[in-house]
């Protein structure tokens, strides 16, 4: 399925992706077992500098990083309240 958005237009947000940020645990490292949403911003900044891991985890961490640096945490807060 292709979208009809002009080039350079970001894709619409996937609500399932946001829900995964609420329930996906960090699988390794200092914060192993903590939900991604609970990770401190400095940890996400470190990944942004060093490189996000490949695959789904990296995509989720990068999404969370973008949410944080753009002040969009309220999106996750609202979703968490509705759960």
Predicted regions and their residues:
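DEDD superfamily 3′-5′ metal-dependent exonuclease/proofreading module
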Residues: 1-83
């Amino acid at each position: 399925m292709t979208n009809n958005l002009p080039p350079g237009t970001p894709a619409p947000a996937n609500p399932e992706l946001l829900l995964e940020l609420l329930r996906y645990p960090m699988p390794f490292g200092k914060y192993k077992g903590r939900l991604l949403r609970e990770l401190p911003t400095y940890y996400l900044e470190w990944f942004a500098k060093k490189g996000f891991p490949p695959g789904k985890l990296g995509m989720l961490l990068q999404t969370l990083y973008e949410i944080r640096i753009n002040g969009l945490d309220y999106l996750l807060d609202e979703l968490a309240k509705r759960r």
